[in-house]
Amino acid sequence: CELSGKVGTFRVKFTLPEDNDSITVRNIIINRDIPFRFSLLRMGVFLALILLGYGIVHSTLLRRPCHQEKLFVRASAAVVTAVCCLGCVSLVWADTNRPIQEIFERESGNQITRELVDAFEAGQVSLETPVDPGLLAMENPYDWSARSADNVNAQWDHVFYNGRYYSYYGIAPVVTLFLPYHLLTGHYFPTQFAVLLYGLIGVVFLTLTYLAYLRRFQRTLPCGMALGGLIVMQASSGIWYVVARTLFYEISIASGFACVAVGAYFLMTSNILSRGRISCPKLGLASFFLALAVLCRPTLAVYCIAAVVMILLALPRAGKHPGVQLAAGKQNAKRIAYLAWGAVPMLLLAGVQLWYNYARFDSPLDFGIQYSLTINDFTRSQFHMGFVFIGLYNYLLAVPKFTWTFPFFFTEFTTLHINGYY
């Protein structure tokens, strides 16, 4: 504990699980000296940021426009990206406590790395995990309190529908990584390295998207500002939380991040948002990867919606060719081809998702989240507008808390009674 001011006496109370339990106090230390800890890495990061800030203000090179120092901007971006990738590898490696060969020869896995793989290999969408008869007999199997009271064995965070287990989580990482790996090797791909792989792809393409944005919209931005913007963008990315805790939940997040980053890069370089000739093949790749992100994590459909709006806004330009006057028929043909490149990949993958939903839950629009076996009974969840304003406040307006310990400030933590917090 940390005490301040005048402290005369204090009492320590231990609460044990059972009445006959005991605890042994071996020693009590008061006023122990706080150890002096010096982190070279932390000081190095602070020093680099200070030097960067000084250089932005005073350096002639860093004040030059990006388009005049293309090589410097690319080299600096490569260094920043390499450092970020090294940081991701370090975080994953620090949590790795077994030989690499043993890790990549796993005979077991989790809901995504093993259960979905086994189900797909068996030609079914339901999981092969056996269901406890007690769960089948329950009036409301989604009531966590009732399951606990009846001592019913239920697979945590699995979807339970019509007497079978399913998985809510996206199938894209299963189809693109885990299933092929198991078919080729007979082993299950490790979760932590799957998260790392997708995280590295996302980090690299996030930088490439940023550079493509600079070339098209911020050519006169000073080099120092451009470099600082890249650092802020990579540092504020949520991928750091993902690679620091590589559970199966993070597979969907990391793979979705990678697909969105790749899709954003091709969307930016297709020139539908900027001047120049529109590249339909790149638009097709953007459509494919953004749709694939939805098959990683359904909530990422918001990026597809945004992409559709951008594609439609660029439709008038799609029928034109720079410096060439085309006939009306050719313009319409080019617009139709443009729409096909943008729509077909997205519609095909949307069809896969809709079929997968119907095969599991008898409705193409039902993703199954309400059938999850977790703490909350999602089948009886309600929407309250007041929670929207609470979320807006906590994410946009809440003032951070400051402390005397590193990193010296934290986000506000708001508790919403049972099982809810920001």
What are these regions (language model features)?
Residues 190-219, 262-266:
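Transmembrane-helix motifs of polytopic, lipid-linked glycan transferases
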Residues 303-347:
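Perimembrane helix-loop-helix junctions
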Residues 261, 282-297, 304, 345-353:
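Membrane-interface alpha helices of multi-pass inner-membrane proteins
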Residues 41-111, 224-226, 330-345:
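Start-transfer (signal-anchor) and selected internal transmembrane alpha helices
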Residues 90-93, 97, 317, 337-422:
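Membrane-lumen/periplasm interface segments of specific transmembrane helices
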Residues 122-169, 210, 233-244, 374-378, ...:
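Interfacial juxtamembrane loops and adjacent helix segments
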